[in-house]
Amino acid sequence: MSFRSVIQEVKGEIGAISRRGFRSRPGRVRRVAAAAEEPPDESSAAALVMRESCWTQLPPELLREVLARVEESEGWWPRRRDVVACAGVCRSWRGIVREIVRTPEASGNLTFPISLKQPGPRDAPMKCFIVRNRTTQTYYLYIGLTDALTDDGKFLLAARKCRRTTCTEYLISLDMNDISKRTDSYVGKLRSNFLGTKFTIYDAHPPYAGDVISKGQSARVIGSNHLSPRIPAGNYPVSHISYELNVLGSRGPRRMHCAMDSIPVSAIEQGGTAPTQTEFPLSYHESFTSIPFFKSKSVRANNSTASLLTQNGSKLVLKNKSPRWHEHLQCWCLNFHGRVTVASVKNFQLVASDESNPTNQEHDDVILQFGKVGKDMFTMDYRYPISAFQAFAICLSSFDTKIACE
């Protein structure tokens, strides 16, 4: 069998598996033929075992080359699901695929769930969109499959609005059907103050090496490569968002600042790097079923986590790009390059603020932009150094009512 035939056969086998697990947008679920849902008979099951054992016993060098070719050829969704399916065959395949697949910063691709916690691409923004469901108070984040604003997209994250007595929370999950802190798909949350002017983004897992976890009087340091397998989901503040008073009310643009507690300002300088999570804690995959979640007293990051970041410099601060008044249209305008089509007070673009620019260099690159394109549809384009999770949480803050600002 030629090497090309080996690659084609691997892609065919993996493609058949991955197509059964591909998710689509709620309300547009693709119907699967009844025959595909029927359990296989004994003969087909035996044949499947034989094929799987054949592939798992390939020499490591040949297997790595085959998987590298598959990863290179399946560059974008929905074909990218074949790469994910390769990682699910067995432990050896998973290890090789994880070594081959690069981070979004380097590749511009979102492949695994951990990619949503990693910085976006440097060269071009990651183009996503958010769908709002007013009835259920839920929000769904998708990555666009094409440049069109009307494609189905690939589901990434979901959020559900929860009103509390003194605040509002948005729970963020990898599962669109079960958005709860009690599931292993919970990745973090956004919490507002009573007035809706200040928000805090909490990560469910340590955002970078050296986080201090505290509960009561005890504390311990957890490195990125030594995460305890029995750490339940906690509250690790990674960003603080504030909205300032708008004297023009709903007619004028909002003023917002985002202090990225887990990203140093050096990340946007020449040769700078941003902290990157490489994997979820072991508990995320295997131990959550046996670990009780803390409800009122969750595990929290100690205030000293901020000092761990600021030892090598201050944190990155983002601000909204000031719009210009258009005399002919009689409205405030920003150049969204065709990605926003409906005027809204929610629309914004974030750039590095002056206080994050000690060298007085111009940082006009838009790191995150968000805008309305339909009644319940919004675009979200983000890039390095923030992640999809952070960008989604920041955009969720724009949906919340601002009592003191409007």
Curated annotation (Swiss-Prot):
Coiled-coil parts of chain: none
Domain F-box residues, every copy: 53-108
PROSITE patterns associated with the record: TUB_1 (PS01200), TUB_2 (PS01201)
Tissue expression remark: Ubiquitous.
Disulfide feature: none
InterPro entries (alphabetical): F-box-like_dom_sf (IPR036047), F-box_dom (IPR001810), Tubby-like_C (IPR025659), Tubby_C (IPR000007), Tubby_C_CS (IPR018066)
PANTHER family (alphabetical): TUBBY-LIKE F-BOX PROTEIN 11, TUBBY-RELATED
Similarity comment text for this entry: Belongs to the TUB family.
Protein's name according to its UniProt entry: Tubby-like F-box protein 11
UniProt source species: Oryza sativa subsp. japonica (Rice)
